[in-house]
């Protein structure tokens, strides 16, 4: 998933190589502010996740690729804890520890293919827009199988190549769609990886993600560039895109619209074969 310096390699198609994203150097500074969600939105996610996770409580949860801890405390609160936020980038973990502390949360230095927890630890595991960062997704999924309890469930919240969301900013950065097609897996690819590691596919879910706040606030958050897609655009493309946004904002022509978010649910069967 990353080196000790927080360099995160994003998986890509051979025809569109993607550079590593340095979350210690670049992304951590504005990430928490740019990606912050109001409590009602966090609760909306928890309510949706609860419908697809094991019914018993408490649940031990792993937040894999937890970043600045945007969801980790909520996972502990909603499902009774403990919750483990596993994140390779030291600066992101430090931000989480400073701003997203919770008595039932532990933040751990770790990579997706080397999760620093014992076998059969978790009842539930969340990957929220982190899977595309894993350089060896097959190894990561095998490691996830190791740390899951029999009957445990995995929620993979990701963009999928065949369902790139139409974000309000998409048209201002014309190459962003192609970049995301290179960054993200397809649903059949994700399903094949998990089933090869012994998981059963439970379902694919799509939820509406509301537009947060007003458009001026959304523009200011976007300027923080806490979108990994932007790491693969040139400075000229970014400057031109933000100039187009400024013109549209002045003209009042930016459309505030919700987007659709996808996630897949997988279960580790009670008699899962050892795929390591």
Regions found by a protein language model. Name each.
Residues 138-150:
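A short glycine-rich, Lys/Arg-flanked "PGG" loop and its adjoining helix->strand segment in the class I
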Residues 183-197:
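Short alpha-helix
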Residues 38, 68, 202-276:
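Conserved Class I S-adenosyl-L-methionine
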Residues 113-124:
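A short acidic, Gly/Pro-enriched loop at the edge of an enzyme's catalytic core
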Residues 2, 6-57, 70-74, 92-95, 153-182:
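Conserved class I S-adenosyl-L-methionine
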Residues 62-64, 68-114:
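Class I SAM-dependent methyltransferase SAM/SAH-binding core
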Residues 123-136:
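A short SAM/SAH-binding and catalytic strip from SAM-dependent methyltransferases
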């Amino acid at each position: 998933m990353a080196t000790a310096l927080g360099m995160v390699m994003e998986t890509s198609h051979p025809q569109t190589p993607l550079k590593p994203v340095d979350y210690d150097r670049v992304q951590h500074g504005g990430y928490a502010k740019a990606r912050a969600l109001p409590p009602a939105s966090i609760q909306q996610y928890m309510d949706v996740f609860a419908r697809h996770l094991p019914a018993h409580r408490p649940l031990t949860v792993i937040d894999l690729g937890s970043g600045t801890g945007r969801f980790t405390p909520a996972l502990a609160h909603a499902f009774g804890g403990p919750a483990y936020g596993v994140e390779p980038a030291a600066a992101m973990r430090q931000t989480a520890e400073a701003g997203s502390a919770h008595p039932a949360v532990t933040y751990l230095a770790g990579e997706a293919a080397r999760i620093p927890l014992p076998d059969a630890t978790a009842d539930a595991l969340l990957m929220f827009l982190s899977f595309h960062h894993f350089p060896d997704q097959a190894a990561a999924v095998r490691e996830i199988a190791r740390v899951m309890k029999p009957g445990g469930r995995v929620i993979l919240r990701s963009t999928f190549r065949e369902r790139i969301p139409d974000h309000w900013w998409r048209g201002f950065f014309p190459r962003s769609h192609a970049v995301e097609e290179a960054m993200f897996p397809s649903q059949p690819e994700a399903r094949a990886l998990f089933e090869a590691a012994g998981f059963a596919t439970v379902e694919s879910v799509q939820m509406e993600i509301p537009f947060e706040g007003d458009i001026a606030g959304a523009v200011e958050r976007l300027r923080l560039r806490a979108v990994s897609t932007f790491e693969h655009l040139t400075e000229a493309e970014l400057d031109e895109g933000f100039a187009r946004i400024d013109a549209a904002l002045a003209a009042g022509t930016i459309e505030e619209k919700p987007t659709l978010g996808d996630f897949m649910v997988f279960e580790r069967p009670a008699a899962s074969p050892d795929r390591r």
